[in-house]
A protein has these predicted regions:
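Structural recognition of the conserved hydrophobic beta-strand(s) that form the central parallel beta-sheet
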Residues: 47-48, 80-82, 111-117
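Post-Walker A helix-loop "phosphate-sensing" segment adjacent to the P-loop in P-loop NTPases
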Residues: 6-9, 34-45
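The conserved phosphate-sensing helix
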Residues: 179-188
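Short glycine-rich substrate-engagement loop in P-loop NTPases that contacts/grips substrate
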Residues: 42-76, 92
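Walker A/P-loop nucleotide-binding motif
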Residues: 8-29
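Short conserved motifs of the RecA-like P-loop NTPase core
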Residues: 165-178
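Conserved AAA+ ATPase "SRH/arginine-finger" region at the nucleotide-binding site
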Residues: 122-124, 137-149
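Short regulatory helix/loop adjacent to the ATP-binding pocket of P-loop NTPases
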Residues: 58-62, 120-136
Length: 188
């Protein structure tokens, strides 16, 4: 909530959201971005996956425009990077470009939001200077939903389906007790 109210002005910069696949990291990061945009319509909020970031950077290098690429990203007020772990193994220019963008935004009081399926300490093949920066703010772990949360998810999903809003509580309880997976598995 604090990130949405005062992006870049809290101790939660960067906000590093991590957890297993299917727990809602991307959804949460996008929701935070939308909240920021609603509260601060004047701010430039950019969401991009790390794979897309890398593809764009590669194209910029091939076109001899890496500085234009970096300048573009340095102009945003809120940068949301999904699946930051995909930066692993890309030693060299892509990590250097991201390092420069990260530093510029952070020093300028801009908000960074990163998602990953790993804790910062579990990332491999990423420069130490980047890993250190990932730990500057708040690392928030998303975990498997508990029973009560599963029940709420099932009820919400049922309400979104025609004719399924009156699902018997015994059925809801059965699913909540027997589905051990992530939110995607609960929603079907």
């Amino acid at each position: 909530m604090a990130v949405g109210v005062e992006p870049g002005k809290t101790a939660y910069n960067p906000l590093y959201i991590f957890g297993d696949s299917g727990l809602g990291k991307t959804h949460l990061a996008q929701a935070i971005g939308m909240d920021i945009k609603q509260r601060h319509p004047e701010l430039q909020v950019l969401y991009v996956s790390m794979n897309k970031f890398q593809a764009q950077y590669t194209t910029a290098v091939l076109n001899k425009e890496p500085n234009d690429f970096i300048n573009f990203y340095q102009m945003v007020d809120v940068l949301i990077i999904d699946d930051i772990q995909e930066l692993s193994g890309n030693k060299g220019s892509t990590q250097n470009a991201f390092f420069n963008i990260f530093n510029h935004l952070h020093l300028s009081g801009k908000q960074l939001i990163l998602t990953s399926d790993k804790r910062p300490s579990e990332l491999s093949d990423i420069n130490d200077r980047l890993l250190t920066r990932f730990k500057w703010g708040l690392a928030a772990e998303l975990t498997q939903p508990d029973y009560e949360t599963k029940v709420k998810i099932i009820h919400n999903k049922a309400r979104s389906l025609d004719g399924a809003e009156n699902i018997p509580e015994e059925v809801v309880a059965y699913f909540a007790e027997n589905i051990n997976g992530n939110v995607r598995e609960i929603e079907g």
